[in-house]
Amino acid sequence: LMTSLSHDVRTPLTTLIGYLDAVHSGIVIGQEREEYIEIARRRAYDLKDYIDVLFDWFRLNSDEFTLSIESVEIAELSRNILKDWIPIFHEKKLDFEIDIPENRLMVNLDSDGYSRVVNNLVQNVLAHSKARRIKITMSEDSKMVLLRVEDNGVGIAKENLQHIFERLYKCDKGRSKKGSGLGLSIVSQMVERMGGKISVESEIGKYTVFIVSLPLI
């Protein structure tokens, strides 16, 4: 584990340092210098996101980790989480549909943990699916609330679906390998600790949909 994580941290850090050294030493000037600065900025944010995921995973698997479970209106919470993604969808030129019901849906959950679940699932689409469209819906089904995050990207091969929530697992070459391989593992563990379940369906070249189910109160 540590060997893999060390490699995944050192590689983007080395790249970041390389771009900054080129700017600092004057090897690049003018427009090229500005481009190097922008690339370095993006690499720094990528590295921050990666480290955030690492902290989440280690915290989740530590003996000190506890969830603050309380009764929460999940529809409103979901809308508040997703509204922050709308400017990013526009920036990425990603078509999107968000359909969250107006009626009150009460669930026992940890608000921060649920936010991490939603954010990781959306980020997974942006980082790995190569999708042009994302659809996020919520519905009731047999005393459960279902959150579906669906994209029309490259899909996930059938042989990979059973491993998708495993720690450090990365899919086939059709999907982007960018990332820690921990994001979906964190999602799965977080959902289970809140008494829910998560599943995935996919067809190569057509779609992938993650379905989070949590019991209604």
Question: What do these predicted regions represent?
Answer:
Residues 156-169:
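Short conserved segment of the HATPase_c
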Residues 70, 90, 95-105:
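Conserved catalytic submotifs in the C-terminal HATPase_c
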Residues 151:
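Acidic ATP/Mg2+-coordinating residue in the GHKL
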Residues 133-143:
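Short beta-strand/loop element within the Bergerat-fold HATPase_c
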Residues 124-126:
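Short helix-loop "hinge" at the ATP-lid/N-box region of the Bergerat-fold HATPase_c
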Residues 68-83:
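A conserved beta-strand-to-alpha-helix junction within the catalytic ATP-binding
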